[in-house]
Amino acid sequence: MAEELVLERCDLELEANGRDHHTADLCRERLVVRRGQPFWLTLHFEGRNYEASVDSLTFCAVTGPDPSEEAGTKALFRLSDATEEGAWAAVAADQRDSTLSLHLSTPANAPVGHYRLSLEASTGYQGSSFMLGQFTLLFNSWCPADAVYLDSDEERQEYVLTQQGFIYQGSAKFIKNIPWNFGQFEEGILDICLMLLDVNPKFLRNAGRDCSRRSSPVYVGRVVSGMVNCNDDQGVLLGRWDNNYADGISPMSWIGSVDILRRWKRDGCQRVKYGQCWVFAAVACTVLRCLGIPTRVVTNYNSAHDQNSNLLIEYFRNEFGEIQSDKSEMIWNFHCWVESWMTRPDLQPGYEGWQALDPTPQEKSEGTYCCGPVPVRAIKEGDLSTKYDAPFVFAEVNADVVDWIRQDDGSLHKSINHSLVVGLKISTKCVGRDDREDITHSYKYPEGSPEEREAFTRANHLNKLVNKEETGVAMRIRVGEGMNRGCDFDVFAHITNSTPEEHTGRLLLCARTVSYNGILGPECGTKDLLSLSLEPYSEKSIPLRILYEKYCDCLTESNLIKVRGLLIEPAANSYLLAERDIYLENPEIKIRILGEPKQNRKLVAEISLQNPLTVALSGCTFTVEGAGLIEEQKTVDVPDPVEAGEEVKVRVDLLPLYVGRHKLVVNFESDRLKAVKGFRNVIVGPS
């Protein structure tokens, strides 16, 4: 009788598997592989090697607390001669001395998560069980059979592997790129992402069913959308929009997801204070990329928050044009969400591809504060019956806006406002470049096209099909040069009379600070022209001077000022409204890299900023992050005040761990100048 087969050890071949599965950054101390693609194992036996004629090897892979073959969370499979498509399999690849090298294959629809792998070796009537190790299984956008497959290597690099990028803020007429450190492969982040799945309410209610459903990126995306906010659960971030962040961190101060996720884990899954839309979106992007789902952050300018699903945002204003209506339905200056790439077998053909997911807690979906995934194509087509939450996302990019002026006697007059169009300049970072890509066309057909009319008809969006009222008099807000924080500047109400008649009216100009979500602050400039005459076929530009001393104490960290012009013509009973959001530029953060960037060789970054204000800055700090360049976030305090016009300079030590292109991301804070962002690309060569 043959001697019993005894396993001495199992080599999980971390280096080779990490290279083959694009998980090298995760495979330093553990095995992380992607589903639907074989990975290597080497079995080392004591005494003798495996003999096919006398030995039987049966493998068992399980995930979750209650694994079962029926749920797809347990797999039993024997060593065989060939792989079977769509099934777990083990195939011998090489045999020498007392070692046996294997290819282990996983189905392209296996649940993602943490697995335990064991072996039962039988020789005749003898048998022994051995624990081979543990591994983590991720979605695989390189595998054609996987629901997240992308056929472009450049897109896989950008949307799965790239650890830094940009989030777009500012305004539709002044788009500002904000650098962000996603850091999905940084130390401990994968474990945190898996923990996030394991504390979601669906797992707590029925762990076996939840783990089974993790085979679907649609399901996982929806769970992540709900878990990034903490409104229903032990989610990551608490949202706050009132500019009172003293007991936490201002949403504008974050520069990456890593610090947020680590804080959440460190504090026992307690909510991190505070987030706003781009922070929710960026953290969701980190989690989804880490799990292997191609994902990008998207910004929509002039984004509607339509609560009652009538695709209409109504503003009620007093006779001076000031909004007096409820703030629950608003036009946000911009709003961020994410798109993830996946098939939709639960929907009709044609709805695969980019899916919108919005983790910012706004409205409940099936009892939970989450939104999506909904096919971007369904939004474009006006197919509002499509899962999930199509009406809400459709309204964000297509809602109509009506302004009502309420007179002293209570009567309402509809104003003409062509300056505010919902759903503009929908933006994301370009693939492989530090540029902005405009993806508005993927959400909306060209304005006025037959396809747009069909989509609006399908969505029953009748407001958009009504021709806009024209009077022959138009007004828009123009800006001058030098729109920098700390400066005085001019804005202009530019009025055009395209009619053969003279028009006379009253012009009210008002500038107020504003948060990105449309909440107005105090006035910082006004003008009231009681009698303004417009000659036939003429133009006029009326200036409004905005002084730093007026806005310095009330400008929010959004750096936005809303300028409103209201032209009232009593003779024609006409109200012409124009608005524009102005973004004030922060000073530039300059970053110099001292020395040649080489792998595993110390490096110094010199970071500087010039105070643009007329007063000194105190409490100055620089915070630095950069996946692959610096292990943990570093903060450098500046002990002395920085006088007006003076330059402040600090140095930070770096240790690049990986060859390639990385971003060093910087945030500057002080008492009077906050959330100033900067970045520098660093190309690291081999040592």
Curated annotation (Swiss-Prot):
SMART domains: TGc (SM00460). It is found in: Cytoplasm, Cytosol; Nucleus; Chromosome; Secreted, Extracellular space, Extracellular matrix. InterPro entries: Ig-like_fold, Ig_E-set, Papain-like_cys_pep_sf, Transglutaminase, Transglutaminase-like, Transglutaminase-like_sf, Transglutaminase_animal, Transglutaminase_AS. Highest levels are detected in the lung. Lower levels are found in the liver, spleen and heart, but not in the brain. GTP binds at R476, I477, R478, V479, G480, E481, G482, M483, R580, D581, I582, Y583. Induction: By retinoic acid. SUPFAM superfamilies: Cysteine proteinases, E set domains, Transglutaminase, two C-terminal domains. One of its GO terms (biological process) is regulation of apoptotic process. Its cofactor is Ca(2+). Disulfide bond formation inactivates the calcium-dependent acyltransferase activity. Cys-370 can form disulfide bonds with both Cys-230 and Cys-371: formation of a disulfide bond between Cys-230 and Cys-370 facilitates formation of the disulfide between Cys-370 and Cys-371, which promotes inactivation of the acyltransferase activity. May also form interchain disulfids between Cys-230 and Cys-370. Ca(2+) protects against disulfide bond formation and inactivation. Auto-transglutaminated: Forms covalent cross-links mediated by transglutaminase between Gln-633 and the epsilon-amino group of a lysine residue of itself or HMGB1, forming homopolymers and heteropolymers, respectively. The modification N-acetylalanine is found at A2. The record marks Y516 as: Important for catalytic activity. Its main location: cytoplasm. Monomer. Interacts with phospholipase C; promoting alpha-1 adrenergic receptor signaling. Interacts with PLCD1. This is Protein-glutamine gamma-glutamyltransferase 2. The lineage of its organism: Eukaryota, Metazoa, Chordata, Craniata, Vertebrata.
